[in-house]
Amino acid sequence: PNGCPRRRGRQTYTRYQTLELEKEFHFNHYLTRRRRIEIAHALCLTERQIKIWFQNRRMKLKKELRAVKEINEQARKDREEQEHKIRSSSSDDGSIGKGVGIPLDASLLKSNDSQSVSLNHLTHKSPDGMMDKTPKSII
């Protein structure tokens, strides 16, 4: 009535469309225009819908990776705090606690970063013993 165009409602995708879009995203986070046209035609969606779905999916992935990083940082801080408590509660004779008599193992005090998920340094050895630096999935 006041001359403003009405905003479109939220797009809902069928399970099949979502599955196909997720499969494509698994292999490619970015689409060429040609591939976007192909997918739009195959799923009976517009190019714009495909483009926006991929933009939203990339933002979702970015948010998930940020959450994983925060969890790892918190785990590292918690581990360092525990190690500090162990160090400060150990007595002069190298045992943990008062009169417990359990020898303190120095290897327990070292940071164990292998429990953290590394986002940047996921490397694996290939069968020939060379390092393969291709990124591996963390999920």
UniProtKB/Swiss-Prot annotation:
Comp. bias (Basic and acidic residues): 73-86, 125-139
GO BP of this protein: anterior/posterior pattern specification; negative regulation of transcription by RNA polymerase II
Listed PROSITE patterns: HOMEOBOX_1, HOMEOBOX_2
DNA-binding segment(s): 6-65
Gene Ontology cellular component terms for the protein in this record: nucleus
Gene3D superfamilies documented for this protein: Homeodomain-like
Locations listed in the record: Nucleus
Keyword Nucleus: yes
Chief location category: nucleus
Keywords from the UniProt entry: Developmental protein, DNA-binding, Homeobox, Nucleus
Gene Ontology MF term list: DNA-binding transcription factor activity, RNA polymerase II-specific; RNA polymerase II cis-regulatory region sequence-specific DNA binding
Record Pfam families: Abdominal-A, Homeodomain
Region feature (Disordered): 73-99, 119-139
Function: Required for segmental identity of the second through eighth abdominal segments. Once a pattern of abdA expression is turned on in a given parasegment, it remains on the more posterior parasegment, so that the complex pattern of expression is built up in the successive parasegments. The abdA product appears to repress expression of Ubx whenever they appear in the same cell, but abdA is repressed by AbdB only in the eight and ninth abdominal segments.
Similarity annotation: Belongs to the Antp homeobox family.
Protein name, UniProt field: Homeobox protein abdominal-A homolog
Organism the protein comes from: Artemia franciscana
